[in-house]
Amino acid sequence: MFITFEGIDGSGKTTQSRLLTEYLSGVYGVDNVILTREPGGTFFNESVRNLLFSTKNLDKLSELLFFIAMRREHFMKVIKPALTQQKIVICDRFIDSTIAYQGYGHGIDCKLIEELNDLVVDIYPNITFVLDSDINQSVARSNKNGYEFLDLEFYARVRDGFRDIVKRNQYRCYLITNVDATKNINEISAIYLKTIKILHAL
């Protein structure tokens, strides 16, 4: 099973992906559940991630191509081998973040991004949880964690992008609305577990 968490920076998806990993590891064993993230997930990718996030004014198409190349490396080295071994993979960000951020946020053609994604991966998530949180709360939380601040209009476009992605992919995407990531951690986790149990009889 392949589960992804999506949302704007500071939405709480990293916390929720970790909590779900801990729960499923208790059920299926730590060796059968993999928690990973994008951009990153391999030693090489983590090094490139640090370089990208410390580089200012990088051309947006160049940035996209870096992300796509990193996704291929991550998919072939981590995600696909784990799924082939029947493990549960939980990923903090995947293809939808690229569409929301680079497409809706930065204005790159979403069709181009989708075609590039199709070029580098051939397995897609079974379940994607999209955390839809208040932009001001999320940005404040993101800044506290040391992430680069982008203007509120940018995050509004990204948020709209995630909502559109959910509408177009209702077979796998679930929008978790009105998220206050600082207060409802256990309540939100229960929603994920209930959804997964219903869909896959875990």
Curated annotation (Swiss-Prot):
Pfam families: Thymidylate_kin. GO terms for biological process: dTDP biosynthetic process; dTTP biosynthetic process; dUDP biosynthetic process. Keywords: ATP-binding, Kinase, Nucleotide biosynthesis, Nucleotide-binding, Transferase. It comes from the Bacteria. The keyword Acyltransferase does not apply. ATP binds at G7, I8, D9, G10, S11, G12, K13, T14. GO terms for cellular component: cytosol. It catalyses: dTMP + ATP = dTDP + ADP. SUPFAM superfamilies: P-loop containing nucleoside triphosphate hydrolases (SSF52540). The keyword Cell wall biogenesis/degradation does not apply. Its EC number is 2.7.4.9. GO terms for molecular function: ATP binding; dTMP kinase activity. Belongs to the thymidylate kinase family. Phosphorylation of dTMP to form dTDP in both de novo and salvage pathways of dTTP synthesis. This is Thymidylate kinase. It comes from Ehrlichia ruminantium (strain Gardel). The lineage of its organism: Bacteria, Pseudomonadati, Pseudomonadota, Alphaproteobacteria, Rickettsiales. The gene is tmk.
